[in-house]
């Protein structure tokens, strides 16, 4: 089935499969595309094509990820599946694949395992709002009581990490059975997708959020004034809108948008995702620089101290060869600029090894516009040594 036949009028969501190694995430991903393809809603993707995940580079980090897409009767989904546990950690922490919701796969034969817990924790840390559970391999469990026990364990685990373990859907089935076309199990995959449709909420679109654009470059147009260029991250820029310009420790500037330029044409507006030049009233070129943000007045404040969930690259990934200790001072590449900051490790953690992921506290030398969920890279001498995202603003 050709790509073009997808109905783009359906609301779009990004989801993914998470869970312990060998519990059937990739088999389930293949089963979903197969079952929906047979219902005329998707194109078929074989297990092998998903399992041989291509390498991607995101913020200087190599991650193996498979992307599949499919539709249900109500929605269009982009779905990510990662072959290895380390790929999941990197994917979730760096936000290479932003997820609006996740399908947690738990093998009924095993019950929740260490990575089950770790993926739920990561989901909580990186703000995946809702999780649907697929209890897999139930065809290999004869004992009905055991199934109930596993479901109860999973629900308790979700509740422990502040997900709605009591009300969230848990669907029992067999991904392999569905992939092989056994009707009983095909039905469970359809039931799963119905649960995903109903339980995972549509995210707020970037366009509907407050306006924010990180400044990439600044120049002067004779007779028109100062222009700041960049890619609009969220919201809409309209000619005539008042804006704040928030910078690296400097006092905030107030201005008005006098024009939005795109592909050398003057427009009335620009929206999230557009690369634009914004004309600013009463601002000198010397007052703005790369790394500042232009935003809706009062919507963003500069902060210098925050908690973050980070992944530190292994040596083989181009990261550090040695561990680092408390008060390590790298650069934090946020949006369009580097800012030096000091890392404080959690109590009881003496040092951080390449390949670790953990929660750290960061204090930047100068305050910059920050919000929860914002992603960044950690750099040292111009090379990326880690990546993460802000989980909590402290001050």
From Swiss-Prot:
Mg(2+) binds at residue 26. Its EC number is 3.6.5.3. One of its GO terms (cellular component) is cytosol. Residues 19-26 are annotated as: G1. InterPro entries: EF-Tu_GTP-bd, EF-Tu_GTPase, EFTu-like_2, EFTU_2, G_TR_CS, P-loop_NTPase, Small_GTP-bd, T_Tr_GTP-bd_dom. It is found in: Cytoplasm. SUPFAM superfamilies: EF-Tu/eEF-1alpha/eIF2-gamma C-terminal domain, P-loop containing nucleoside triphosphate hydrolases, Translation proteins. Residues 10-204 form the tr-type G domain. GTP binds at residues 19-26, 81-85, 136-139. GO terms for molecular function: GTP binding; GTPase activity; translation elongation factor activity. Residues 136-139 are annotated as: G4. Residues 60-64 are annotated as: G2. Residues 174-176 are annotated as: G5. Transmembrane segments: none annotated. It catalyses: GTP + H2O = GDP + phosphate + H(+). Keywords: Cytoplasm, Elongation factor, GTP-binding, Hydrolase, Magnesium, Metal-binding, Nucleotide-binding, Protein biosynthesis. Signal peptide: none annotated. Residues 81-84 are annotated as: G3. It comes from the Bacteria. PANTHER family: ELONGATION FACTOR TU, MITOCHONDRIAL (PTHR43721:SF22), ELONGATION FACTOR TU-RELATED (PTHR43721). Monomer. Belongs to the TRAFAC class translation factor GTPase superfamily. Classic translation factor GTPase family. EF-Tu/EF-1A subfamily. GTP hydrolase that promotes the GTP-dependent binding of aminoacyl-tRNA to the A-site of ribosomes during protein biosynthesis. This is Elongation factor Tu. It comes from Cellulophaga lytica. The gene is tuf.
């Amino acid at each position: 089935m050709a790509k073009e036949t997808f109905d783009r009028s359906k609301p779009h969501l990004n989801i993914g499969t998470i869970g312990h190694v060998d519990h059937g995430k990739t088999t389930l991903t293949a089963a979903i595309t197969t079952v929906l393809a047979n219902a005329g809603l998707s194109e078929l993707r074989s297990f092998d094509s998903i399992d041989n995940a291509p390498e991607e580079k995101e913020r200087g980090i190599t991650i193996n990820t498979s992307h599949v897409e499919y539709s249900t009767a109500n929605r269009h989904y982009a779905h990510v599946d990662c072959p290895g546990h380390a790929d999941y950690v990197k994917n979730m922490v760096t936000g290479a694949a932003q997820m609006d919701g996740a399908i947690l796969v738990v093998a009924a034969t095993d019950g929740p395992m260490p990575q089950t817990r770790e993926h739920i924790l990561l989901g909580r840390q990186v703000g995946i709002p809702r999780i649907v559970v697929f209890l897999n391999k139930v065809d290999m469990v004869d004992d009905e009581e055991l199934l109930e026990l596993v479901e109860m364990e999973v629900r308790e685990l979700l509740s422990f990490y502040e997900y709605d373990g009591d009300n969230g859907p848990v669907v029992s089935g067999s991904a392999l059975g569905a992939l092989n076309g056994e009707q009983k199990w095909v039905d469970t995959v359809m039931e799963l997708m119905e649960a995903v449709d109903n339980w995972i909420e549509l995210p707020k679109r970037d366009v509907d959020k407050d306006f924010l654009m990180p400044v990439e470059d600044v120049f002067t147009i004779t007779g028109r004034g100062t222009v700041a260029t960049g890619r609009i991250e969220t919201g809409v820029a309209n000619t005539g809108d008042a804006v704040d310009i928030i910078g690296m420790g400097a006092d905030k500037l107030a201005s008005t948008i006098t024009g939005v330029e795109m592909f050398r044409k003057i427009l009335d507006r620009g929206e999230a995702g557009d690369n634009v030049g914004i004309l600013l009233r009463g601002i000198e070129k010397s007052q703005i620089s790369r790394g500042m943000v232009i935003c809706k007045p009062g919507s963003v404040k500069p902060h210098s101290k925050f908690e973050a969930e980070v992944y530190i690259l292994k040596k083989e990934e181009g990261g550090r060869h040695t561990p680092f200790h408390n008060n390590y001072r790298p650069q934090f590449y946020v949006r369009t600029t580097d800012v030096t900051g000091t890392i404080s490790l959690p109590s009881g953690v003496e040092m951080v090894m390449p390949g670790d992921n953990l929660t750290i506290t960061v204090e930047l030398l100068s305050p910059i516009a920050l919000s929860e969920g914002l992603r960044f890279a950690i750099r040292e001498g111009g090379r990326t040594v880690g990546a993460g995202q802000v989980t909590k603003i402290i001050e």
